[in-house]
Amino acid sequence: MLVAASARDAWSDTHWVRSSVDAFLADQARSAGATLLESTQLLSARFDPLEHRWTCTLKTDCAKTACASTEDSEASIEATWIVDATGHQGLQTPSIDNPDDSSFMHTRTGAVFGHFEGVAPFVAASSPEDPFCGDDAAQHHLLDEGWVWMLRFDHGVTSVGLVQPSSTQRSEGMFWEVLERHPSLAELMQHAKLVAPLGQDSAKPTMGSVDRMSRCRARASGPGWVCLPVSYGFVDPLHSSGIAHSLSGVVRLAEALLSDRNDCYESIRTYGADLRREIQWLDLLVAGCYAAQPSFENFIAYACMYFVSAIEFEKQLAVDPGRWPKGFMQCHDSRWVPVVNQAYEFLVRSDQTHVRNEPTLSQFPIQVRRWIEPWNRVGLLDPASANRISHSVAPKYASSIEGLCRSLAK
């Protein structure tokens, strides 16, 4: 299946190397006047509710930075707000009590991953009818249980990761064993060489591993602090929603923090409630795909729930880039949300007894095509399209973050 996320290569925004993104954001922050402290640890943070002010003690590892001294340095700073952008680690301070609250999540997956040189192109799957080169896209190689991602960057490195249920054991050896059991993947990786990430105690590359990626915190905010979406919760890389979700949080929090204190807290309370609903929604969009496995046809059918959500959401952004739509990825859409719930329940009911009702499940793509018809303007599940969609969303330039920021600055 091929679905174009961008109308043209010039507007595409996929396959960002994380280190490049981080460097870009750091440069933008500096240009905007922010002070950037790298290799710095938060030792303590104390909040004064009367003054609405934090007093924070920081420690910088001068051996890793351009400090004048070779000894670690400590500094004290004050701030009215702390924005938690730490990701899964969370801020470690007694003043912020925010335990894990992931029990509600349907998606429970882990991953083992690395950056490789020498990954071969996936020529075997190409077709003259392809709307674009599949190697230029985020590839999802579906297994009976789980999947393998391949993201080819333009400097010869490919990010490869194996995603499976969190109950599955993870190791570099297991990664290669799974690939060897799938000849098409084994052929792609036959001459691949691991180049990153580097091990903590050596310069030798060692594959990274996360036992459970799916997570959520109890709260998105508290007195004087607030989380970006990536720190509050994350579901799974299946639909590549993480960066977009976090950027949506940047836009919303910027607007809230620039308002007066009363309006700010009200906006942040709303933001927190929205984040919980958004994580639940993304969880639903992902979990249904896993519930559909090992059927490729049913997986594609349920994946259309994500595609419709993305198309409708980006359509709203394109109409008015200066107005943030209510509900990330249509999670507040009163017409669309029941359709996705219905599709998910259909799959779950058919598998509740652990004896899959194959005749019923075989009808799932037909049902989905009927359910999505009012929104389906691009030919999803249309036999004539042969699962190849050349155009699905509005031009990215119309919904750029730059356009949103210009509107916020007015």
Language model: regions and residue ranges:
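FAD/FMN-dependent oxidoreductases across multiple families
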Residues: V148, T168-V286
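Generic detector of well-ordered alpha-helical packing
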Residues: A23, A85-T86, S231, P237
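Conserved N-terminal/central alpha/beta ligand/cofactor-binding core
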Residues: M1-Q41
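Short amphipathic alpha-helical face segments that pack within enzyme cores
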Residues: S20, F24, A111, H245-R252
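C-terminal helical "tail/cap" subdomain of flavin- and related membrane-associated enzymes
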Residues: E255-K410
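Predominantly flavin-linked oxidoreductase catalytic cores and closely associated redox partners
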Residues: Q28-A192, V250
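Alpha-helix N-cap/helix-initiation motif
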Residues: A10, T14, R18, D101, ...
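Tryptophan-centric aromatic hotspots in well-structured domains and transmembrane helices
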Residues: T14, R18, F47, W54, ...
